[in-house]
Amino acid sequence: MELKIGRAIIKHGLEDLYEYSDVDVAIVGAGPAGLTAARYLAERGFKVLVFERRFSFGGGIGPGGNMIPKIVVQEEALPILKDFKVRFKPAGDGLYTVDPAELIAKLAAGAIDAGAKILLGVHVDDVIFRGDPPRVAGLLWIWTPIQMSGMHVDPLYTQAKAVIDATGHDAEVVSVAARKVPELGLQLQGEKSAWSEVSEKLVVEHTGRVAPGLYVAGIAVCAVYGLPRMGPIFGGMLMSGRKVAEVVAKDLAEVAYAVRA
C-alpha cells in the first residue's frame, strides 16, 4: 500500500507541475484579491495558476479584525460576495460583516471550481523577462520550506503571458522586478498609514498593469503607489481582484487578436 500511495502522489503531482509550467496567468498570493482574480479569469477560459507561500488560503482574511472573527465589506462589493455565495450581515452606514472562515473557503472553492489551479507552499523567487524593451514573461519559484531553511536550491520556472502580484503589503513580485530588471521602470513608494475611505477607492482605481506582462492587485497596490492602508475592510481587495481580471483579460484578448492579424 505504501508504494502505491507514494507512486500515486509522485505521478499525479508531477503531472500537475508539468501541466502548469506554461499558463496564461500566474497569480502570486491566494488572498482576497488573488482568489477573486483567479475565479473571474478562469471563468473566461484562461489557464490560471495561483502561487501561495503558505499552506493555507486567505491572506489577511483569517485573523479578522485583531483576531475578532469578523471582517467588513462595503455595499459596492456585495455583487462579488453574491457571486461566491458568501453570506453577509448589515452593520449600518453601507457596511456589512462577513465570517472570515466562510469567505476564505468560498473564495478558494470558487476559484478552484472555475478551473484555477492553486499551488500551496511556494515561494516566488524571481521573474522571467524577455525583449527590449523588457516584459515580464513568467516566474521562478521554490518550495517555501527550502526558502525558509536558507539553503541554496535553484528554482523552477513557470511561463506566463501575464503575472499578477497579489502578495500583500510587500508587493514582493513588483519589488524583485524593480530591483533586478530596472529597465522596467518600476518603483515602490511604500504604503502610507490608514485612511480607509480614501484607500478603498484608490486601491481599485490604481489596480492594473504596472509593466508589460506584470499587474498588481490588492494591498500590493498601496505599496506600489504610496496609498494609505485600510485595515480589516475587504471590499476594496475583492473589487481590485475583479478589476485586475478584467484588465488582464482585455490585454490578453488584444494580444491574441494582434497575433491572429
Swiss-Prot record:
Listed GO MF terms: iron ion binding; pentosyltransferase activity
Species whose genome carries this gene: Pyrobaculum calidifontis (strain DSM 21063 / JCM 11548 / VA1)
Name assigned to this protein: Thiamine thiazole synthase
Subunit structure: Homooctamer; tetramer of dimers.
One Pfam family from the record: Thi4
Gene, per the UniProt record: thi4
UniProt xrefs under HAMAP family: Thi4
Role according to the record: Involved in the biosynthesis of the thiazole moiety of thiamine. Catalyzes the conversion of NAD and glycine to adenosine diphosphate 5-(2-hydroxyethyl)-4-methylthiazole-2-carboxylate (ADT), an adenylated thiazole intermediate, using free sulfide as a source of sulfur.
Catalysed reactions listed for this entry: hydrogen sulfide + glycine + NAD(+) = ADP-5-ethyl-4-methylthiazole-2-carboxylate + nicotinamide + 3 H2O + H(+)
UniProt: NAD(+) binding residues: 33, 52-53, 60, 124, 152-154, 219
Binding site for glycine: 229
